[in-house]
């Protein structure tokens, strides 16, 4: 059961469409995709620079920039327009909502992209995807990648 369904059941409340706060922020790259590569250590993927190296030729050919979002202490990835630590949650929502695609690790930003029906490519590590996938949005626009084989249980990090 998805965590949203569990919370709804426990609260005795129906599931509705979330209304996320949105505040304007100037965008210095357009068109663009968003990337939030970092999250808690058990969900961190170590090869984002290689991913960007693979994506850049295709994105550059189409004039698409990469906007990195996240916390101020997170590493800056190469070839990105850096917004991490410079925006509020509402401003980050604005960036996600207006992007062509959201790419990242399992985090709140992937769920926000789902709410805004922005296409998603998201990496999952230690959570069972069927319990935590972006609940809202068109599922045909969501590519959820996991190293876990179908039908098996994920390994859980000790944090």
Task: Indicate residue ranges for each PLM-predicted region.
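Catalytic machinery of carbohydrate-active enzymes
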Residues: 1-159
């Amino acid at each position: 059961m998805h965590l949203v369904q569990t919370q709804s059941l426990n609260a005795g409340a129906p599931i509705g469409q979330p209304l996320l706060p949105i505040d304007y922020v100037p965008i210095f790259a357009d068109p663009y995709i968003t990337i939030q590569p970092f999250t808690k250590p058990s969900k961190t993927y170590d090869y984002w620079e290689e991913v960007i190296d693979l994506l850049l030729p295709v994105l550059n050919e189409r004039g698409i920039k990469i906007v990195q979002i996240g916390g101020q202490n997170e590493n800056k990835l190469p070839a990105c327009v850096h917004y991490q630590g410079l925006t509020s949650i509402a401003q980050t929502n604005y960036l996600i909502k207006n992007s062509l695609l959201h790419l990242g690790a399992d985090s709140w930003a992937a769920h926000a992209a789902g709410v805004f029906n922005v296409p998603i490519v998201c990496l999952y590590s230690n959570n069972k995807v069927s319990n935590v996938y972006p609940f809202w949005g068109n599922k045909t626009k969501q590519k959820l990648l996991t190293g876990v084989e179908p039908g098996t249980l994920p390994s859980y990090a000790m944090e």
